Amino acid sequence: RELTVTVLGEKAYAIVEIKPSHEFYDYECKYTPGMSKYICPADLSPKSTNKIKRDTENIFKGLGCEVYGRADYLLADDGQYFFLEMNTLPGMTDTSLVPKAVAAEGLSFEKLVKKIIELSQ
C-alpha cells in the first residue's frame, strides 16, 4: 500500500492512501482525474496513524525541512512501513495530495496557501 503524509509547519496532517488504477502510481494515475482513488484519512489503526504521523514530523525536522512537505511511504501487509522520500515542493493542483490531506482536517485551500505564505516569511 502507498501512503503519503503532509507536514505543514511542524504538524503532520491526515494520512492519504493512494490506490492507483494501474499496477504503479505512474504519471497517468497521478495527473488524470479518476485514475487513482485516494482514501483520506487512510484506513489505519489509531496507533499506526499516530506513529506514522510522529515519525513523519521527526523526519521532516531531521532533514532540516521548513514550511511544508510531503513524505511518501510503502506499507507492508504486516503493518511495517518504509519511508521512501520527503518531497519538499509537493504539487498544489486539483489532483494533488497536500490539499486533500489538509482539507480532511478542515483547512481550506485558501487557508493552506495563506499558512504557507505566513510560514515562509
Q: Residue locations for each model-derived region?
A:
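Phosphate-binding site of ATP-dependent enzymes
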Residues: R1-R54, Q80-F82
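ATP-dependent carboxylate activation and anion-phosphoryl transfer catalytic cores
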Residues: S45-Q121
